[in-house]
Amino acid sequence: MTAGRIIKNFNGYYYVETPDKEIVTCKIKGKMKQVRFSAVTGDMVEFEKNPDGESMIKTILSRRNFMERPTMANLDCIVIAFACADPDFSCLLADKMLAFAERAGIEAVLCLNKTDLVSEAQLEEIAGVYRKAGYTVFTVSTFNGTGLEALKEYLNGKISAFAGPSGVGKSSMLNALQPGIALQTGKVSEKIGRGRHTTRYAQLLPFNGGYLADTPGFGNLLAENIDARELYKYFREFKNFEHGCKFVPCTHTHEPVCGVKNAVEEGKIAASRYESYLAILDEIKLLKEKSGKR
């Protein structure tokens, strides 16, 4: 048996990199195929090498972490990538992605691209919200190169993935960090205000002692498989004010004495973050109702 890491999976084939950097194309057995997310990019596996036929993955080793969207495992970091403009920044989408990362137990940072399209005040209006919430925020421009060195230094030696909506410049950022690492880039559609998908699957690419992954973009993101009762845990700044809640647990919605709601009123928690929290709660409720009707 040989050990390795899945660096790409596409059309039922799994490309496994061994410790000596050999890439072996593998399949998985039928029983594994029946389990959703049984093997994903980033998984450490053991496989039976067959030089005369298909090599077969036999075992998926224990995961450090797993994220469903993008579908990857064993990440050190996820870079939540958004544009400041073209397409416009979406607080709700950013907050969903950060909540998903918190749920998965993966370190997340926010990377704001296209800073050359906005003023300093506009940039700080976005970045300040997330720095206040306790996140590291990188501000970059692939047009003029601003901020790329700081991001590159942070990513050195890590297994990281870039995730975000279509058209925000994920592939362009990767190409700026290491020329040629991600070749396809696309423009934002003027009609729909979103990017055209150019990355079709997640692939780990060697980068400065670690790996970087570009991942497929998206136009929308559903809050599936999140328990409404657990959502507050995924807004990291809430915990700093929960001591002011009269009821435990507190949903931070209708309760008369709530430290989180007070913090929002006092400007200690950004109103946009709290609005995203309420919107995601409503979405979870709606998804649950629709599921119950099936």
Predicted regions and their residues:
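Structural detector for short beta-strands of small beta-barrel domains
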Residues: M1-F10
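A short macromolecule-binding patch
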Residues: E22-K29
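Helix-rich effector regions associated with P-loop NTPase G domains
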Residues: G30, R36-P51, L61-C77, A83, ...
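Short, Lys/Arg- and Gly-enriched loop/turn segments at beta-strand edges
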Residues: D52-I60, D88-S90
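Phosphate-binding glycine-rich loops and their immediate beta-loop-alpha structural context
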Residues: A85-G134
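A conserved segment at the C-terminal end of the G1
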Residues: K170-G186
